[in-house]
């Protein structure tokens, strides 16, 4: 049996940009993506700490070291510039065969 477990978590990502008329996704600074071990087009869950909104989308890389966190397309309606987010990704594992320690990136601490 496979179970879904936390693979990566980016804490306290701040929305820096919104692009409503875009095809969708969340843009994340490529350096932050690498630290969190997220891949291009990987599915993520977004939790907005300011308003409680939750959504699922996929990741696209932003300019390295720009600190960009952009909600794109319909997701842009789920937050405002300056809102703080948790960005979560999950993996399916067989708990009898393996254990997964999640990668935690805390941007509030400048991890």
Swiss-Prot record:
Residues annotated as the enzyme's active site: 25 (schiff-base intermediate with substrate), 58 (proton donor)
Description of post-translational modifications: Is synthesized initially as an inactive proenzyme, which is activated by self-cleavage at a specific serine bond to produce a beta-subunit with a hydroxyl group at its C-terminus and an alpha-subunit with a pyruvoyl group at its N-terminus.
Entry keyword annotation includes Lyase: yes
GO cellular component: cytosol
Class of the enzyme per the UniProt entry, highest EC level: lyase
Principal cellular location given in the protein's record: cytoplasm
Extent of the signal sequence: none
GO biological process: alanine biosynthetic process; pantothenate biosynthetic process
Essential cofactor(s): pyruvate
Subcellular location: Cytoplasm
Keyword Lyase attached: yes
Pathway the protein takes part in: Cofactor biosynthesis; (R)-pantothenate biosynthesis; beta-alanine from L-aspartate: step 1/1
CDD domains cross-referenced by the UniProt entry: Asp_decarbox (cd06919)
Family: Belongs to the PanD family.
PANTHER family: ASPARTATE 1-DECARBOXYLASE
Protein name: Aspartate 1-decarboxylase
Organism of origin: Coxiella burnetii (strain RSA 493 / Nine Mile phase I)
Taxonomic lineage: Bacteria, Pseudomonadati, Pseudomonadota, Gammaproteobacteria, Legionellales
Gene behind this protein: panD
